[in-house]
């Protein structure tokens, strides 16, 4: 029986291994992690991450051919194929700080694999890593090999949170990069045969190692670039009276462009986009390509501009001050159908409002109060380090309350900011919300969730990203 072990029980490792176990009942799959609370959660009824469909997959396989364990060395030693899905955070100090990927956890995993292995292994990069990481890992394993043969493969994930299980069931493509040697091709074929249990052969792409590593960074950079492009146009729409939804629809009808990732918003978030672009920028700089690096930097600059522009709009609309005013924030996750708050635009928006001394009341259906307070208290890149290295008792913001529903959040509020596109926010009783808010009552829709005209009929003053401005807002000071 083939045995697969995955090091890292996070957003990628857990769901990916669960689906492999479901689709390959003859393969034993073990997910290992040094975090006992995380493994305990995977073995409980309350999984550590929220993802539609994940519960059902885990419950069907767990205890049959899917296992979660803290006995890392035992299962690594026994495995034929080892997936490494550990954090690759952005460095916070030293060479490349603020841009380069920190491969500390990857290197530790590689050294541990070399220490405990007693048979040949296929080691698979699942984490997003810089180009040429496989070469570095290969050197560590080879120099500590004790006669054992290691083949390194790159198999980047292309999952979107909120649809991860569907993405795993029906992927656009599965990318496998390996060495162009007889042993390398054999290793690629071994991993290909795992995915072939449910993925059509024409969707399994094989490349060399470096192409696979760069493809992941490039894919995320291209997606983020589309979001920043439409967000840049949204600012121009507001200035000219155009409607970004209409513009995006017209542009997306061009078959060369297509409609996906053309929704204007308060900005992109998530664990990958900004981190991977910064990594790409650093790689370009290291390879003497400053013009290319500067091109990709602009994607992040527009994203930061969009968030600060949103905060400025809130403050300037409300008589140029939100000091002491209650502002309701609906949605804290970086997008709907996930509880993930990593790099969520809500953090920067809340910080901007808190900087102007607002009182903030937050509601998100999937994010806990502890997580929200932790996110608001943490430094820029702290979120991407293991839990035991994060602040254990973050200082709670006295101006922030986290509540159990949207109606409680908006009660007596002066303004309402929609920062995540949860479906439930489309069907709220906005008349009830309006009746319980201070007047004038403002709605700042950072996700274009609501119908601005219907809300204006109720009495709200409405700002929607990239839409023609409310008459009230036209008379307010210009937003920088």
UniProtKB/Swiss-Prot annotation:
The active site is at residue 272. It comes from the Eukaryota. GO terms for molecular function: NAD binding; UDP-glucose 6-dehydrogenase activity. Keywords: NAD, Oxidoreductase, Phosphoprotein. GO terms for cellular component: nucleus. Pathway: Nucleotide-sugar biosynthesis; UDP-alpha-D-glucuronate biosynthesis; UDP-alpha-D-glucuronate from UDP-alpha-D-glucose: step 1/1. Substrate binds at residues 157-161, 216-223, 256-269, 334-335, 447. The modification Phosphoserine is found at residue 393. GO terms for biological process: glycosaminoglycan biosynthetic process; UDP-glucuronate biosynthetic process. NAD(+) binds at residues 8-13, 33, 38, 86-90, 127-128, 161, 272-275, 342. It catalyses: UDP-alpha-D-glucose + 2 NAD(+) + H2O = UDP-alpha-D-glucuronate + 2 NADH + 3 H(+). Involved in the biosynthesis of UDP-glucuronic acid (UDP-GlcA), providing nucleotide sugars for cell-wall polymers. Belongs to the UDP-glucose/GDP-mannose dehydrogenase family. PANTHER family: UDP-GLUCOSE 6-DEHYDROGENASE, UDP-GLUCOSE DEHYDROGENASE/UDP-MANNAC DEHYDROGENASE. This is UDP-glucose 6-dehydrogenase 3. It comes from Oryza sativa subsp. japonica.
